[in-house]
């Protein structure tokens, strides 16, 4: 499961996820990518589930890059605990996703295989996504 090795502070404020992705919005490493067209949060479990779906479909071919990392802690209070008495403990980590962010990239497989692998991965994610390919000469 992906999570930060160390953090300066254990807990973080909720914040607001606004704007569009200005970084990580183009295919940089592979030939094909899965790009988010939606705004939201991806948990470490969702990122891993989609990665497994891609890996299983392409079998031994290709190289996969995960372009997002869950570095924001989400804290929750236990069930049936009254309000107050401080903030709950960090339960899991999420990656904040803006529209336009490339989530996964792949190289070394035909386009049709990559499309199908990303379609299976997209079913595991709570965001709308689109298939993108590298811009030649860019």
Curated annotation (Swiss-Prot):
Residues 1-13 have a biased composition (Basic residues). Gene3D superfamilies: Ribosomal protein L10e/L16. This is Large ribosomal subunit protein uL16. Belongs to the universal ribosomal protein uL16 family. SUPFAM superfamilies: Ribosomal protein L16p/L10e. The gene is rplP. Residues 1-22 are annotated as: Disordered. Transmembrane segments: none annotated. GO terms for molecular function: rRNA binding; structural constituent of ribosome; tRNA binding. Pfam families: Ribosomal_L16. Binds 23S rRNA and is also seen to make contacts with the A and possibly P site tRNAs. One of its GO terms (biological process) is translation. GO terms for cellular component: cytosolic large ribosomal subunit. It comes from Delftia acidovorans (strain DSM 14801 / SPH-1). The keyword Phosphoprotein does not apply. Keywords: Ribonucleoprotein, Ribosomal protein, RNA-binding, rRNA-binding, tRNA-binding. It comes from the Bacteria.
């Amino acid at each position: 499961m992906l999570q930060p090795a160390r953090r300066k502070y254990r807990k973080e404020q909720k914040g607001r996820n606004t704007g569009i992705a200005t970084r990580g919005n183009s295919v940089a490493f592979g030939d094909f990518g899965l790009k988010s067209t939606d705004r939201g949060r991806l948990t470490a479990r969702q990122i891993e589930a989609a990665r497994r779906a891609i890996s299983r479909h392409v079998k031994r071919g290709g190289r996969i890059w995960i372009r997002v990392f869950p570095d924001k802690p989400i804290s929750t209070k236990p069930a049936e605990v009254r309000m107050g008495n401080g903030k709950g403990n960090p339960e899991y980590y999420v990656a904040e996703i803006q529209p336009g962010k490339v989530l996964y990239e792949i190289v070394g497989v035909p386009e049709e295989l990559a499309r199908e692998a990303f379609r299976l991965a997209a079913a595991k994610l709570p965001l709308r996504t689109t298939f993108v390919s590298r811009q030649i000469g860019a």
